[in-house]
Structures are given as C-alpha cells and as structure tokens.
Amino acid sequence: MLGSFAKKIFGSANERRLKSYRPKVAAINALEPEWLKLSNEELAAKTVAFREELAQGKSLDDLLVPAFATVREAARRVLGQRHFDVQLIGGMVLHEGAIAEMRTGEGKTLVATLATYLNALAGKGVHVITVNDYLARRDAEWMGRVYQFLGLTTGIIVHGVDDGERARSYAADITYGTNNEFGFDYLRDNMKYELSQMVQRGHSFAIVDEVDSILIDEARTPLIISGPSDDKSELYNTIDKVMPRLQPEDFEVDEKQRSTNLTERGNEHIEDLLRAAGVEIEGSLYEAANVTIVHHVNQALRAHKLFQRDKDYIVRNGEVVIIDEFTGRMMPGRRYSEGLHQALEAKEHVQVQPENVTLASITFQNYFRLYSKLAGMTGTASTEADEFAEIYKLDVVDIPTNLPVCRLDEDDEVYRSAEEKLRAIVREIEAANAKMQPMLVGTTSIEKSEQLAEAMKSHGYKQIDFAEPRALDKLYAAARAEKPSKLFAVLNARFHEQEAYIVAEAGVPGAITIATNMAGRGTDIKLGGNVDMRVAQECADLEPGEARDAKDAQIRAEVDDFKAKAIAAGGLYIIGTERHESRRIDNQLRGRAGRQGDPGRSKFFLSLKDDLMRIFGSDRMESMLVKLGLKEDEAIVHSWINKALEKAQQKVEARNFDMRKNILKYDNVMNDQRKVVFEQRREMMAKPSLEEMIDDMRQGVVDDLIARHIPRDAYPEAWDSEGLREGVKTSLNIDLPIVEWAKEEGITEDDMRERLQKAADEAYAARVERNGVDVTRYVEKQIVLQALDHLWREHLLTLDHLRQVVGWRGMAQRDPLNEYKSEAFQLFDELIAQLREATTAQLSRVEVAFEPPPGENGFSGGMQEISGPQGGSSGGPIFQEALSAAAFAPPPLAPLEFSDESGSTATLARPAQSASRDEPAGGYAKVGRNQPCPCGSGKKYKHCHGALT
C-alpha cells in the first residue's frame, strides 16, 4: 500500500527516468528549425565536425543533442521518416546501455539509428545484432542509406560470407549481423594463427534487436565449433531397434523437467534386450566400462519418449531438422548435442551423422558480456527485467507508445478437450471472417498448425499455395469485393522461405494467417497490407515510366482503402490456440495487433489437454468444471482462470531463470579460463618472438622432472636416477649420464638442476643454429599455438565430463559448484604443465626441411559450427555447418623432421587440426590412453605424450 501511495506522489522509477529525458528531447526539437535550413552537404559535414569535437576532449554525452537532431533530419530527407519524441527517448535509453521496451510497430529499427550513429562517431565500431539474416540485410540496406548520407560506412555479416568480406564489414563504422555469426566469428578468430587473419576488431558497443529472444530464450544455447569424431552409427541403430520393445513400466517421463529415466525393472529389461541384440556389455550394464552404452540408451529413450516429430523437429530431404520452440522456425544446420540428434536420426531411419568433438565454445551470456557497452530493443522485456538486471546488468525502460494502444485483450476461453477447443476456434474464425476482419492465429507447433489447417479445410476453406505466381491475387480480389475469400495462409517451418511476405500481408481485410508461435517476428503487420512489398513485387517487371508510376499509385490507393476496411472490421484479431510457458511469448503474439494506435483484439482458446494446463495441475480445474456442470462445446471464461494461468507461467519462468543462472555459474568458471587462454593466444601471435617464453618453458620442464624423480630433501641414493634419465631423454631429447652424476660425492638437487638446464639450453641452441634463428622463431610460435589449441580442446571435453559428474556429489553433502571450481582450477594447472612439456618435447626434436612437397597445406579434416545446450539434459539445439578448413590452418610450413640422439629422423607434416582424439602418437602407437605413459613420467598416457596426438 505504501509503495502504491509513493508511486502516486513521486511516480514509478520508470516514469522518473522518462521524465529525465524530456529536457534533452526539448533541446533536440529546438534545433530542428535550424537543421531544416542546412543543405545536404552541410548536414553530412556534421559527422566530421562531431569527430573533431570528440578528438578535442568532448564526450559522446556532450554530443547527444546535436547528433540526434542530425540523424532525425537525415532520416526525414533520406527515408521520409521523422523520429517521434518517444523514439528520441528510446535512442537515449540505448545510448545509456539499457533495454528499450517498445511495442510492435513503434519503429525500433529507426530508433536504433540514433544511438548507433552517436556511438559510431567514436570510431570503435558498433554492432547491430538481429535474429536472422533477412532482418540483418533488410536493416543494413534500409538504415544504411541514412548512415551513408552522413558519411558513415556499414557492413553486413551473414552466413556464407568469406573472411575477407567479414574483415571489411567489421572494419566499417556500423556492422549488422546475426547473433550466431558474431559469436562464431569470435570463436573462429581465436583459432587463427596470425593476427592479420582475424576479422573482428573488438567489442565496444552492441545493440541487440529482439534482445529477449537472444539473451533469454537462447541463453542456454552455447555456440560450439566442433570437429568430427568416431562413427558410432551402428551402435545408435542397434539401440534404437530395442526401444519400441520397452514396456510402459520400464521408464518414467517427467515433462516438467524434460527428462526420462529407466526404472529398476527397465534397467534389467534393457540389459537383456541389448545382449540379445548383440551389444557387448562387460559385466553389469552400469559398470564403468559400459558408460558409453548407458549414455546412448538414455539419449535413445529421450528421442523416443520426449521428442515429437513435427513439434520438436521435422524430417526433410532425409535429414532431421530442429524446430525452434520459440519461433516455430526450422533451424537447418542446427543439431542437438550429446548424441541426441544421432538418436533422433536412428529413430527416423535416416542416415546417422557422426558425433562431433568440441574445439571451441561460448554461451551467448558470456559472449555479450564481452562488450564494453550493451543495449537492446524488444516489445516484451518487463517480465524478464530481473534476469536482465542480474545477468547482464541491463535496466529495462518501458518507452510509451506514440499513440494510445487501442487493442482489446479478452479473457481466455477454456474447454475440456482439444477437439472442443479446435471447433470453437474454427467457429470464431468463421465469425470474424464473415465481417472481413484480418486474423493471425498463433499455434505452438507445426503439428498444431496443420491440425487447424485440416479443420479449416473441412469447413470449406482453401490453403493458399505460395508456390503459385501472384498467390495472393484472389485474396486482394475478395478484399475489393468485400466478400470472404475462404482462403487461409499457413506459416510454419515448412514454409519459412515465404515468412516475411506471408506476415506482411496478414493485415489485408479477410486474411487468415496461421503461424507457429512468433514466426515472422521483426516484420510489421500493417492493416491493409505492406505497400512497399506489394509495389516491389507487382512492379518488378515494369520499366520506370508512366505505366510503373500509375501502377504504383493504384497499389498505394488500394492499400489505403484496404486499411480503412480492416479498421472498420475491428483491426487485426489475434487468436492464440495455446498458452506458452512464458508470458513474454504470449505478450509478443498479442502485441502484433494494435500497432500505432490501430484497433485490434486478442483472445486465447485453451483446453485442459494443453501442455501448460496438463503439466501444471489441470486435474483440479477439470474436477471443478465437472462440478459446475460444464457441457460439451461450452467454455468457461473468467478472469480468475487468467490469474491462475499467469501464476503457473510465473513458476515456469522462475524455474527457467534458476536453470539459466545455475548454468551461468558453471560456465563462468570455464569463461574465466577461456579469457586467459584467448588473451595469451593473442599475445603470442602479437609478439615477434617467443624465445623468452620457450626458455621459461624449458626451465619449467626441468623443474618438473626434478620434482617428479627427486624427493624433497632426499639423499642421492633415494633418487629415481634412471627414471630421471628416461624423462630427460623423452622431454628434452638429450641422453645424459644422470645415473653416474647421482653417484658423485656431494652432489645436490640444485647441482642436478643446474647441469640439466645447461645441457638442455646448449642442445636447443645448437638446434637453433642448425635451423636458423628466423625459421626457429616462426616454428616455435606455430608449435606453441598448435599445442595450446589441442590441449584446450581436450580441456573442454574434460570440463564437460567433470560437470556431469560433480552433480552427484551433492548427495554427499558437498557443494557441486565448489567442487567443480576446485577441480577445474587443478585441471587448468595441469593444462599449463602439459603445454610446457608438449612444446618443449616437440621443439627439442624439430628439424626443418626447406622444400615443402607440392600441394602440402598441412591441414586435413573439416570443422563444424555448433550451438547447443549446456549439459545433455536440457536437449537444446546446436548449430552445425561445414567450415572452410583453410580459415583455421596456419600459414604453409615445410614439414617438420623430428630426430633423436641416435641420428634417426622422421618427417612429420603439420598435425591435422581435427584429428580423432584416439589417434596414436609416434612410437607409442599401442599404448592405451589410460595406461602409464612409457616416458616414465608417472602420468597416464592421455595426459602426457598422448596429449600430442
């Protein structure tokens, strides 16, 4: 009560913040008459003047008012669009590094030009990030005209662009692109071997469009660059064949947690089935030797019992393609991680693709926190304001609309069964269509949209075939005649190519558009249709002249007439066929109607069999409806139901927030290590010589050998002299009389260290002299970078396994996160030690052949990009696509020859970047990865010389 009383007197925090912007808005408006008088050249010259003022010590804040006035006037002249006062406020919010919540149709794309231009003046580059390539291209071409007018350059980063073009785009003042492309470029840059090959130039300021979709919905989706691993398709197919033979009592499914588990009976049954199918099981199924089989069984169970075709994925052209649960779009190239995608391929009897090994990864949460300043725009952020504040330190500012919202949001209608709900939706569509009201019907999956489409067809409606030329002509003809066309369009993952076109025309009178979730987000639905899109399509074959001008004028007049008819019919009608887990997604759907003061309405139709209702306690509601005497095809409509649903959604949102927060805590551990590795890597590439580092590494290896074989304060008789001799021979490639030295009277540990260091330095100096100083310095850098990359990949895999294991330690009253932090730190220390040893061992054997064989580029194997869920249980998508191997290969280098003291040599081409982890190394080809390393170090082979494979 006190809070509401205080708000009445002082206003809310949002209102107070908005009020603080008003004086600047007034100052910008005061400059407008003066700016109107400027010639185009004088207006464009403002950019040079602003940059000179920055160089003289002024801040960007000092330039905000004149810079915003300049952009507003440039947009008016170039685009014919003038920023409203509320849009100026939105630009100020973005400049301050906050999230501007702006309703659909309020011109977020135009708002971004204000903060983008101002921050681009600093010359550090501004990244404008969108959710797909179409929007990146559209916005860059559309708003790029304003920037070009003002003397700024723009670049576009989309899929398929080569490194040269990427580097030019990043060098521009303003760079447009998708979140995936920016993130992958960061990872790719940190796998390059020369600074000149890197394309990004830092992370100064980013504006993220649809910020909730990218920073919240995709927060659990790390970007991963991977390489191929062993082919296990036969095992997937074998396990898949036994899945249908499981009985209901063999497993449990938890839809809330999106998890499946075998029961005790199921464990015994599956073991019998696997043995009968010929799968080799050592002892009991759950013994350590069978961990891979158990993992594949669990993934096959999830594939069969949790994931549904045409809801979670579709099969297209012999491939399993994931469907984005938030947008309903197909995501070609994305793959589920942890073997789940392979399990789905086996289930659908398509070719099982090999699993992949992670080479580099980062989550969106940690990528976007690289920016010195981050801002975002969306129509729905308030429900996630706490998460934006806690994770990204971003405030959410609710920007008022330019005109009042006239949309009527009606209470939900709840039916007992899905069939009753479907019939009610069709009746509602027929009633609205009879008065020519345009409709957008939102569904949660392809399956649901196609069920509704079939129901529509059974009532005499016909689906528009967008493969036909001029597919919407019949719809336009019906709108002219003011008679229902009985046509409807379906927009789901199967028809994503026509997405923007279908959505843009959803505001034509009588149009019925069925869309999965928020497909088409980013494209405005204007009442009457999209005039620019129609002109572009219908005038494409006309040459400039009177005929084209007449056609243009006729289309514009018709769209104005259609708009008037749509308004008279009540504006756009949003029909929701199911509530989403997140209120934000529901609000996004509602927000498609009522743009720029247009009328509109929205209503959700629900049934007790809907996922949200079924999972979150519809049993009590069903018994209550029975007591109330609810009959078939009757609905209950009450604000109490809306509130109950909202509470259920809040619970889900809170749970998802906790999951994302927990993931971030673990990922922060890896992120700290990633930053160290990437920073060190860049420093190595920047230095002309790593001589000092190599010397330190060699000294470190000597210290490690002494510590390993000479116990502290022990007499020489207790030293492992033979082990030390073998270790020195392996790690430093010198054979020394260490056993004899140890027998000398009065020799100490320090004496031994000094002799080893001197011998190692002299041997390496002789090798440098033979190979040449310049060549050696170059080879040193390449070998260090290769060794670091390989060990980092192994480290990522180890951390992933560690993360899966530490969760069980909570049962022993130990904090899993602290356990993870502690062991991850120890593993990182081991990585540094392994880097020293691997680099020193290779460099002590290197001989350079100066005539490389023709065609040798030193690289084999492909790499793939992946974005996928953290941990195997979340089942999120990963993004995978073939990459050019040359982008990662170090510059061509002659084959390296490794020799030992006996004089024998072996020529070795540059190690392949994507070699299998299990490929044997050199003379240790028959050593098991978990056996002691033959070098005598006492370590397991995989952590010693096995790390060099």
Curated annotation (Swiss-Prot):
User: Cofactor comment in the record?
Assistant: May bind 1 zinc ion per subunit.
Q: Which residues bind Zn(2+)?
A: 933, 935, 944-945
Q: What is its EC number?
A: 7.4.2.8
Q: How does it sit in the membrane?
A: Peripheral membrane protein
InterPro entries with a match to the protein in the record: Helicase_ATP-bd (IPR014001), P-loop_NTPase (IPR027417), SEC_C_motif (IPR004027), SecA (IPR000185), SecA_CS (IPR020937), SecA_DEAD (IPR011115), SecA_motor_DEAD (IPR014018), SecA_preprotein_X-link_dom (IPR011130)
Necessary cofactors: Zn(2+)
GO MF, one annotated term = ATP binding
Where are the residues of the annotated region Disordered?
852-876, 896-939
Q: What is its main location?
A: membrane
What keyword terms does UniProt attach to this protein?
ATP-binding, Cell inner membrane, Cell membrane, Cytoplasm, Membrane, Metal-binding, Nucleotide-binding, Protein transport, Translocase, Translocation, Transport, Zinc
Q: Name one Pfam family in it.
A: SecA_SW
- Compartments (UniProt record): Cell inner membrane; Cytoplasm
Enzyme class, spelled out:
translocase
Q: Name one GO biological process term.
A: protein transport by the Sec complex
Q: What are the record's GO terms for cellular component?
A: cell envelope Sec protein transport complex; cytosol; plasma membrane
Reaction catalysis annotation: ATP + H2O + cellular proteinSide 1 = ADP + phosphate + cellular proteinSide 2
Q: Where does ATP bind?
A: 87, 105-109, 524
Subunit architecture: Monomer and homodimer. Part of the essential Sec protein translocation apparatus which comprises SecA, SecYEG and auxiliary proteins SecDF-YajC and YidC.
Similarity section: Belongs to the SecA family.
Its biological purpose: Part of the Sec protein translocase complex. Interacts with the SecYEG preprotein conducting channel. Has a central role in coupling the hydrolysis of ATP to the transfer of proteins into and across the cell membrane, serving both as a receptor for the preprotein-SecB complex and as an ATP-driven molecular motor driving the stepwise translocation of polypeptide chains across the membrane.
Report what the protein is called.
Answer: Protein translocase subunit SecA
Name the source organism.
Methylocella silvestris (strain DSM 15510 / CIP 108128 / LMG 27833 / NCIMB 13906 / BL2)
